[in-house]
Amino acid sequence: MFGSSPTEQGRFARAWTAWENALANLESPGFGSSPSTDYARAFARIENHYFKNLGFLSKSQQIKDNMHKILDIPSIIVQGRYDMICPPGTAELIHRLWPNSNLVMVSKAGHAMSESGITTALVRATEQFKN
């Protein structure tokens, strides 16, 4: 995805993006759609840039170690029960550490924001903070 050959970049980026898309949706047929090369290259490069830089966290426990900074901020955590990209256990852990949080576990959803249960929960969460 970062090599000098545009053909190779496109091939690997499309494979990465198709794999991610196959995992993201609970109703996935098990193979990802075939995104455009430009979209796939941008998506895969951004995502892998974060992975390569460990999410720009200086240490693995940084989020947990800094929870005290946001404890008073109300939040709604929306999580798909069958999310294979960001496992539900991580949302449950953050929820336990964050007293001002509300965890909405969407029972029939994976990772994709486009899944109807996730979309509905995100809109509801946004509406709660509107005022």
Regions found by a protein language model. Give the residues of each.
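Catalytic active-site module of serine/aspartate enzymes centered on a nucleophile-bearing elbow/loop
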Residues: S101-N131
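Short beta-strand/loop motif that positions the catalytic acidic residue
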Residues: I70-L71, I77-Q79
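Short, glycine-/Ser/Thr-/acidic-enriched flexible segments
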Residues: Y82-D83, G110
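Alpha/beta-hydrolase
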Residues: M1-N66, I73
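Conserved alpha/beta-hydrolase "acid-adjacent" motif
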Residues: M84-T90
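Short, conserved loop/helix-junction motifs that constitute active-site signature segments
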Residues: H68-D72, L97-W98
